[in-house]
Design a protein with these regions (language model features):
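Active-site anion/phosphate-binding pocket segments in diverse small-molecule metabolic enzymes
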Residues: 137-139, 178-185, 189
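Short glycine-rich anion-binding loops that position phosphate/pyrophosphate groups of nucleotides
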Residues: 1, 79-81, 212
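Active-site nucleotide/adenylate-binding loops and adjacent lid/helix of ATP-dependent enzymes
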Residues: 27-113, 117-119, 129
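Glycine-rich phosphate/pyrophosphate-binding beta-alpha loops
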Residues: 84, 141-144, 210-217
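A short, GP-enriched loop/loop-strand-helix hinge that lies immediately N-terminal to
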Residues: 1-29, 44-52
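Conserved metal-phosphate-binding beta-hairpin within the catalytic cores
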Residues: 10, 114, 183-215
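Phosphate-binding site of ATP-dependent enzymes
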Residues: 91-170, 177, 203-205
Length: 217
């Protein structure tokens, strides 16, 4: 319900709804297009290599292109999928090939990203349109797994979020500003949750924006 299709249906039916419109929902659901927008803002994010499903027919060439860019480990993601479905971490070539095939089950556009070592944090954003955009304080995700995958989000009771964590440098001030800028750039309205990593030196790295956050938020 957050990729713009339901929003478009509601608009055609002239039914009011809460949250982002068609454009913001569709763009934010597509990780590749979100990255292109965030690149334009000059906000740091994980380096990435886009891969199309049809390129997996020549797996050796595709994997070699990725390996020429990144060292292991890397993360593989479908461009359009929520709740971390189809996301995997690869420590070697065999795991990368398996991860690409799994991600391709969920979407024809894939992303392979460098691994960012840091704390996972999130920031809520409200407003948009004619209203002032306001960002919340920062929450930190304490995942009970190697990374915050589908099972860690929904099935592992050890995963939790803490509010107002102590962060290095001026990360706590940077994050709300960056979250509001990204929300505005995708034409957000109503509410969204913007996720980041914070590295040990205080550097803030954008992860993704969720225009209709789940109950883990």
């Amino acid at each position: 319900g957050e990729d713009g299709t339901i929003q478009g249906l509601l608009e055609l039916a002239k039914i009011p709804y809460v949250g982002c419109g068609v454009l913001a929902s569709a763009v934010s659901m597509d990780k590749l297009y979100t990255k292109i927008i965030v690149d334009g803002l000059g906000i740091r994010q994980a380096a990435y290599v886009p891969v199309m499903r049809e390129q997996l027919a020549d797996m050796d060439r595709t994997v070699s292109r990725i390996e020429s860019r990144f060292s292991y480990p890397v993360f593989i993601k479908p461009s359009n999928a929520g709740s971390s479905k189809g996301v995997s971490k690869a420590e070697n070539r065999a795991e990368l090939e398996a991860g690409l095939r799994e991600a391709a089950r969920h979407d024809r556009k894939l992303l392979v990203e460098e691994m960012i070592t840091g704390r996972e944090v999130e920031c809520a954003v409200f407003g948009g349109g004619s209203e002032e955009i306001k960002a919340s304080g920062v929450g930190e995700i304490l995942a009970a797994a190697d990374f915050y995958d589908f099972d860690a989000k929904y099935y592992n009771a050890e995963s939790k979020t803490v509010t107002d964590p102590e962060l290095p440098g001026d990360a706590a001030e940077q994050i709300p500003r960056a979250a509001a800028a990204i929300f505005k750039a995708v034409d957000g309205y109503g509410l969204s949750r913007v996720d980041f990593f914070v590295k040990a030196d205080g550097e803030v790295v954008f992860n993704e924006i969720n225009t209709m956050p789940g109950f883990t938020a």
